[in-house]
Swiss-Prot record:
It comes from Orientia tsutsugamushi (strain Boryong) (Rickettsia tsutsugamushi). The keyword RNA-binding applies. It holds the Pfam family Ribosomal_L22. NCBIfam families: rplV_bact. PANTHER family: CHLOROPLAST 50S RIBOSOMAL PROTEIN L22-RELATED, LARGE RIBOSOMAL SUBUNIT PROTEIN UL22M. Belongs to the universal ribosomal protein uL22 family. This is Large ribosomal subunit protein uL22. This protein binds specifically to 23S rRNA; its binding is stimulated by other ribosomal proteins, e.g. L4, L17, and L20. It is important during the early stages of 50S assembly. It makes multiple contacts with different domains of the 23S rRNA in the assembled 50S subunit and ribosome. GO terms for cellular component: cytosolic large ribosomal subunit.
Amino acid sequence: MFEAKKSAKATLRMIKISPRKLNLITGLIRNLKVSDAIMQLKFSKKRAAVDVKKCLQSAIANAENNDGLDIDNLVVLEAIVGKGSVMKRLVPRARGKAFRIKKFFSNLYITVSEIK
């Protein structure tokens, strides 16, 4: 969609939210200008929006400080959600039994790039 010149990346690992829920938020910001993406995340009521916003701001800072890119021309090129590790816990039940519950973690990879 956009012709990218240079890009900067940021990753956030071991986020305590399932990848399925996190992917709902990242779908909102893909292919948006960075300023529009931050506004989307700022007014979102989802809990995952805070973590995505933190990772996006890290990618913006990497683009500005490491690569010298102009913030006004940055676009969210990729927002990829990966499956992290799964923490397994036991919940005591009746008659001495125990049920296993899974707590999912996610990894988030955001790439921003400067457009022409």
